[in-house]
Amino acid sequence: MNPLIVRGIRERLRVKHLIAAGLFSLILCSTIYLSAYLEGAEGDWVLDRETQNWKRGEPSPVEGARQAFTYLLALQGFFLMFLGTGRVAAITAEEKESGLMDYQRMTPMNPFSKITGYLFGLPAREYFMFAVTLPFLLHCMIVGELSIDNVLHLYFVFFSSVVLYHLTAHVIGLVVPKPRAASWVSRIVVLGLYVFLPAFGQAGISLLSFLTILPPYFGKMLPELISRQSNDY
């Protein structure tokens, strides 16, 4: 295995880190996912035309799982795209400041192996937190009857975006001298892509949206998530 990945795992996935990160991810994910799932599974409010009163429709676990999917995807993005990007930038800046980066350049490794080691070794804890959410994703796919092709397409773009953001964070860490500043600069860049780009898209500037997961989500997943609800009406 890549020695930089091994070093990242040993430094950032010690027992105390595993317990803390695992509990944080599990509690947060289970709370968000189950809240959205149970709310959606109870059924939608339907107007009774005879009594003019609102009543809940039939319980639908499928609808609950589909409603929870978006919340789960957002949480996974928070772990890898926000926390992971900041981690890569901060540790890169820290190692550059301490001189460890110069030492790594002298090791007998090709550039591709070094970059791969940094991309997957530095955010090892965030990848572990993402892995904790995978059972919830599996439940969502099975109960929600989601298309495997659409899910694989979405997560292929998801991980491509994660690699792009982490590469950008690595460059920011090499340029910005302070670890904390590098971390927040990289996180603000990611936030800008998902907060400000939709506004630019309404103005006709949609080119940068292809740096995000928004096109496959709105183009493939969202129509499937709302298709059952549309058919009910």
Q: What positions do the PLM features span?
A:
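Transmembrane alpha-helical segments and their membrane-interface loop/helix boundaries
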Residues: 1-68, 150, 156, 160-233
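Hydrophobic, aromatic-rich alpha-helical transmembrane segments
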Residues: 63-75, 115, 119, 123, ...
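Long, hydrophobic alpha-helical segments
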Residues: 68-94, 98-100, 111
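Residue-level signal for the membrane-embedded core of alpha-helical transmembrane segments
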Residues: 76-83, 131, 159, 163, ...
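Hydrophobic alpha-helical transmembrane segments that constitute the membrane-spanning cores
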Residues: 77, 111, 115-145
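Membrane-water interface at transmembrane helix exits
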Residues: 89-93, 137-141, 169-173, 177
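Residue-level hotspots within the lipid-embedded alpha helices of multi-pass solute transporters
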Residues: 91, 126, 158-162
